[in-house]
Amino acid sequence: MSNLDYKQFTERHRPHIQPPDSIIFVTYRLAGSIPRATVREYKARRVWLEDQGTHIKNKLRRNKSPEAKRWLEQVEKFKREWFVKFEEIMHSANTGPMWMKDQRVADIVAAGLQKLDGDAYRLDAYSVMSNHVHAVFKPFLSGNDLIEGLKEGRPIFTSEHPGLSRIMHSLKGSSARECNLVLSRVGQFWEHESFDHVIREGKFYRTIRYVLNNPVKAGLVNQWGEWRWNYCRIELIDKL
């Protein structure tokens, strides 16, 4: 079986399931592409937010209290602010790894995204840049796909489709091995953490345009279609 075949999950590791029909915008980057001091600041603030969430866990489950609502708003604001900050750093970077400048490496990363199209997700768009990748896709896994059972007295969940964390593990793992081989290097290739969020209603085409225009914004091409490592699902092109 491939690493995306039939899966088993314990209760503790039950996959995070997005709302039905959710479309995900994800950004993942090379290890070391953001200065360590910036990463430390980000992680410290994230831990603080997580601690606040632990204190109001029961309220968050009900999602009704003003305190829980304020915390969720803080989380969304935090994610937006740091996404923008990381983007600015990566686009203006003149130091740090830029392995995808090597066409062989960029081709491997793009091929990995294409490989899971129709298997783990419906791929809508991606852009492979020198030190990071943007992708938009719709995972096939939903809450209705999970089958609950027992194994050695413990609850488990099985599904034919991988969750988001498993998708990212597959994308990063296989491409990291191939890219390191091409580059004759060893060590961590991708940063472990990725940015991801569900695209809100009415923001889909705006997000697609943002992804595809990354190389245009960086001054690498004049039109997004000129960038070899851009992809857009053909049904969407006329609507951009």
Language-model segments: which ranges?
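Short catalytic/metal-binding and nucleic-acid-binding patches
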Residues: 1-240
